């Protein structure tokens, strides 16, 4: 589990990430792939505003693949599923407006290098995201702790949103992000202890 604190336009936004116990199957070149589902729950000023579910799979070489995102938005009375997409056929539990993508995305390498470019979302005009590694080997300090060997990534889109800078820690994922007028930081994580242990091992 991971918990983030986001400050936006004078309001406090809390995001809670957990992996659900069940997996979801997808096909890659005719081969079934079991994906773990990351659920992100977002609260604004204590009110639930969005839940998204994101199936992920990791290849033997460490590459991370992204297969879909199902969005349930609760602001303004709820019922909005804008931005939902998946690879393959929809299931009864998927939002009816879910867009179909031709292939999986988010081919995030196991060891990103400076200048690497990858796309976690590639289905414009529904979703679009391009990530560029801007820096590596960073130590980043957030309320959840200090994380060594982080990478800095610039996230851009053709859909009009502002560029976003994100910092990722190995074995944890995103720990910090920043756009004009908005900042998010990891404040608690069940992965943090492992990161601290790894850091101690590196020092020894």
Q: Model-flagged regions — what are they?
A:
Residues 1-204:
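Conserved functional acidic sites
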């Amino acid at each position: 589990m991971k918990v983030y604190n986001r400050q936006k336009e004078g309001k406090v936004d809390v995001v809670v990430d957990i992996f659900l116990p069940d997996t979801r199957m997808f096909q890659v070149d005719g081969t079934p792939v079991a994906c773990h589902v990351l659920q992100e729950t977002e609260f604004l000023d204590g009110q639930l505003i969005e839940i998204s579910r994101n199936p992920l799979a990791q290849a033997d070489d460490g590459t991370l693949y992204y297969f879909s995102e199902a969005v349930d938005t609760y602001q303004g009375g709820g019922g909005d599923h804008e931005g939902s997409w998946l690879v393959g056929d929809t299931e009864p539990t998927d939002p009816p407006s879910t867009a179909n993508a031709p292939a999986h995305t988010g081919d995030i390498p196991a060891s990103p290098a400076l200048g690497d470019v990858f796309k976690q979302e590639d289905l414009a005009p529904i979703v679009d995201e391009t990530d560029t590694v801007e820096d590596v080997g960073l130590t980043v300090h957030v309320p959840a702790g200090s994380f060594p060997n982080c990478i800095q990534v610039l996230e851009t889109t053709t859909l009009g949103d502002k560029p976003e800078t994100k910092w990722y820690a190995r074995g944890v994922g995103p720990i910090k992000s920043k756009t004009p007028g908005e900042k998010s930081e990891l404040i608690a994580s069940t992965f943090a202890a492992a990161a601290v242990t790894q850091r101690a091992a590196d020092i020894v």
